Design a protein with these regions (language model features):
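Active-site cleft segment of glycoside hydrolase catalytic domains centered on the general acid/base Glu
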Residues: 97-98, 102-109, 133-240, 246, ...
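Bacterial signal peptide processing site
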Residues: 12-14
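Glycoside hydrolase catalytic-domain groove-lining segments
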Residues: 64, 68-71, 214-220, 232-308, ...
Length: 425
């Protein structure tokens, strides 16, 4: 993430304090070494739903079949950074969770403490919304809805400051803070499509950045966009950040290969940002399927026929895609500092049928949205609530056992050549 000193702890990858970590080997997974991979290169994973899944009874198992803390499993296999989303107040007026992990600050603290225990830094992803913020919606938190703009900006600053202080007080190793999630022309109820919209968006981002600098002066500040295939839009984001003098370190992009174009384009777009504005760049979200099958009785984002050329829906295909994204950021992108995999631990809640899983999603918030989210987001979550849509893109099977493909995060550093590697395992 830029400055080497910031990564001193993070680069002690796969080695929780006081523990030796055995080498990772594989007889079936073919991984070409990523040359010139810096020791402090970020190999991260979003795990925001883990506590909700564990509340449902989900357990995680290492490659020897032993039940193990999932954060220890991730650390052993090369993950050196954990990402967690934070929503302002993801509960309805009766205290029922909206789902998607019910990702409030308490959830972030619980995850952050476990990540820190196993030698991993935390990226805090503030959505500045009560539920999902993405290119389709950037809804303002309910408690800010009746505020004028100046009061909202002040509240965003104070909220960011106070939430970060809670994480620091809990002993969490915060390495990076993301101000907004996939803020493509909108943020916290503001839109670039109206006069003065960009100015307001950038001032709000600056308010969040100011809080980070005060509470976590050594942490990196990241901004996050998506759809890198829309090259002109990325140039617009970069120009506006520069014009309004936003204080940030990292320009982050989502990259889902089945939506977002080629790796060549990704490298070119991010390199241009890095060269023009002197910023670090990274992939904040990526993922790929190891199977076309669904395991929780709720339709997946991608399935049969959705694969990208050269990457079959197998564990080998999943690992190869991840390896190539890492290589693209490390060797073909100016200023590339890392890659985060999105929700590689989000698996089935464990029910034997849809009805059992639905009850778990509603009670513990382990699906993408509960029916209670309709109070806040009636048009999307209120219509399509349900389970996990990415369980076939996790690094654990439906029963919580680590896949062979998870080893890719370790094997990219040394390589693991398997002749005639099967694409079907």
């Amino acid at each position: 993430m830029v400055v080497v000193t910031i990564f001193t702890t993070a680069c002690n990858i796969n080695r929780p304090p006081g523990q030796d970590v055995p080498a990772v080997t594989s007889d079936t997974l073919h991984v070409e070494k990523v040359d010139n991979l810096p020791e402090d290169f970020i190999l991260g994973m979003d795990t925001s739903c883990v506590p909700a899944l564990e509340a449902c009874g989900v357990k995680y198992y290492d490659h020897d079949g032993e039940e193990t803390d999932v954060y220890e499993i991730l650390s052993r296999n090369g993950i050196n950074y954990i990402r967690v989303r934070v929503w302002n107040d993801p509960y309805d007026s009766q205290g029922n969770g909206y789902g998607g992990g019910n990702c409030d600050i308490e959830n972030a603290i619980a995850i952050g403490k476990r990540a820190t225990k196993y030698g991993m830094k935390l990226l805090v992803d503030f959505h500045f919304s009560d539920f999902w913020a993405d290119p389709g919606k950037q809804m303002i938190p309910i408690v800010w809805q009746n505020m004028d703009y100046d009061k909202k900006r002040e509240s965003l600053y104070a909220y960011t400051r106070d939430q970060l202080q809670m994480l620091i007080d809990a002993g969490v190793d915060v390495g990076m803070v993301q101000i907004g999630n996939e803020t493509n022309g909108a943020f916290c109820g503001e839109s670039s499509s109206v006069p003065g919209g960009w100015k307001r968006i950038m001032e709000l981002i600056s308010a969040g950045s100011k809080a980070v600098r005060e509470i976590c002066p050594e942490a990196l500040v990241a901004v996050h966009f998506t759809n890198p295939e829309n090259v002109d839009s990325y140039f617009s984001y970069g120009k506006n950040l520069e014009y309004y003098q936003v204080d940030y370190d990292v320009f982050a992009s989502s990259y889902y290969p089945y939506w977002h174009g080629t790796l060549d384009n990704l490298a070119q777009v991010l390199s241009d940002i890095a060269q023009r504005y002197g910023k670090k760049v990274m992939v904040a979200e990526t993922s790929y399927a190891y199977t076309a099958a669904d395991s929780d009785f709720f339709a997946n984002t991608i399935g049969e026929g959705g694969n990208v050329n050269n990457y079959p829906f197998t564990q080998q295909g999943q690992a190869s895609l991840v390896r190539d994204v890492i290589d693209t950021l490390a060797n073909r992108t100016t200023g590339g500092i890392g890659v985060f995999y999105w929700e590689g631990t989000w698996i089935s809640a464990g029910g034997d049928d849809w009805e059992q899983n639905y009850a778990l999603w509603e009670k513990y918030g382990s699906g993408w949205a509960s029916s209670y989210a309709a109070e806040y987001d009636p048009d999307d979550a209120g219509r399509w609530y349900g389970g996990c849509a990415v369980d076939n893109q996790a690094f654990f099977d439906a029963n919580g056992y680590a896949l062979e493909s998870l080893k890719v995060f370790r094997l990219v550093r040394e390589g693991n050549i398997v002749e005639n590697s099967p694409n079907a395992f």
